Amino acid sequence: EFGTRADEEVRRMYEAWKSKHGRGGTSNDDCDMAPAMMSRRRRTAGCAGGVPRHLRYIDAHTRGDAGLHTFRLGLTPFADLTLEEYRGRFLGFRARGRAAARYGSGYSVRGGDLPDAIDWRQLGAVTEVKDQQQCGGCWAFSAVAAIEGVNAIATGNLVSLSEQEIIDCDAQDSGCDGGQMENAFRFVIGNGGIDTEADYPFIGTDGTCDASKEKNEKVATIDGLVEVASNNETALQEAVAIQPVSVAIDASGRAFQHYSSGIFNGPCGTSLDHGVTAVGYGSETAKDYWIVKNSWRPSWGEAGYIRMRRNVPRPTGKCGIAMDASYPVKDTYHPGTGTATARAAAMDVIKMVLA
């Protein structure tokens, strides 16, 4: 019968999942600690005799593929969480009205000037994948990744910067209870810079703002921010061709929770609840995709990244990726206010990419 697995197979898969994702305890206790992973049958048949609820969903996706899906699901770090627990612990973006940015709608390179593909990881503008743990600070991780990117492009120096400083010190947002990337950019601008990850490390929860570090260590600075035109994937592509960009998505679905690899084209809405960073784009077998950096550690997705379908019929983009995008500005990389000089500077970067 579809959806059933032998007790020993379930046990082996569960033990492998525990080992990969750092879970501990005895087998029986672990079964009780992972109710979401097991069906109600475990109450009478025991953990090894139960059918993993998430595994049944994953199996259904795999067997029903038949060429319909371009992505795979697996037992991710969230396989022991119900959908409600997953949403509550890891999705912390809070959508708000968009205020005017210093550089308005920004500058861009148009049409045929855009490279067919770009990957800022390969160009030295993306730090390692981080882990927000059970803190809803995705918005801070998204903003910091974008700042790390533009700072690396402008200075030639890739430095891991501090999410914890923003979580602790940005009074406009709510730390691990949620926030918005644009507010994080504004905090860094007003603060005169941001500290390094090494000096102000992430602790996985809200902390007290360390004023000594906040005022004395301003390793990276930004001078403004740009809000990308909403509901326009071409505008987002133009922005990502210049630098890593903070984006918000709807990550509330089971398919996203269990994403393992491939180009994500699964079901999702546009109720934006998660901040991530678009660090590139490309195409595979005539399917366009965004390269998106997440903050759920390297064991989720494709080494911590997800490729999301690009150029979909809806103007919002897949999972709303084109609805609320923004990026930080450094005057040394973005001279002027969207003039021909700024576009020329952007073209220099693109020429380097295409060389």
Can you name each region flagged by the protein language model?
Residues 1-355:
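Catalytic-core signature of thiol
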